A protein has these predicted regions:
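C-terminal and inter-domain tail/linker signature
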Residues: 1-157
């Protein structure tokens, strides 16, 4: 059942369906990656909806959106995302390794995505990413900005 939940999650992501993605998480789920640390299906779902809406919002960014998954097991997956980073308009190719734990109903209880933040920041941010992407300072700035964006997104709903 857990492998099917992972497949359902990424199929919804490929369609940019953040609501369906949220339905894959338990109410008390936790999500963590290099940018976000979230608790609860509401927050996690809002993050996915915010990201999906950012891609869907403009035809030029929608045309660059590609998601590929592979090596899906009942506890992990590898996925690659091609997209335009909406803040800078720069193209990004990000390789992510995901690890999951599930509740008894097969819903995601913990989701941890790992990716090379410096590689991501060089693509997404350009020169600032090249120079500072390896530093905690830039990572914390990106986290803070992402958190503020998510807070604004939640306030609108």
């Amino acid at each position: 059942m857990s492998k099917q939940t992972i497949e359902r999650l990424y199929a919804a992501f490929a369609r940019l369906d953040g609501h369906e993605m949220q339905a894959c998480y338990a109410a008390n789920a936790r999500f963590e990656d290099e940018v976000f640390q979230l608790e609860g299906a509401r927050e996690i779902g809002a993050m996915w909806r915010m990201l999906c809406e950012a891609v869907s919002a403009q035809p030029e960014t929608r045309g660059h959106w590609k998601l590929a998954t592979r090596d899906i097991t009942d506890r992990s997956a590898h996925w690659d995302a091609n997209y335009i980073f909406s803040t800078t308009g720069r193209p990004v190719f990000n390789r992510i390794d995901a690890e999951f734990t599930f509740d008894k109903r097969g819903l995601i209880l913990q989701h941890r995505d790992r990716f090379d933040f410096w590689a991501w920041s060089r693509q997404a941010l350009g020169v600032p990413g090249w120079l500072l992407g390896w530093t905690p300072m830039l990572r914390n700035k990106v986290r803070s900005q992402a958190r503020a964006n998510l807070r604004r997104f939640l306030e609108k709903r």
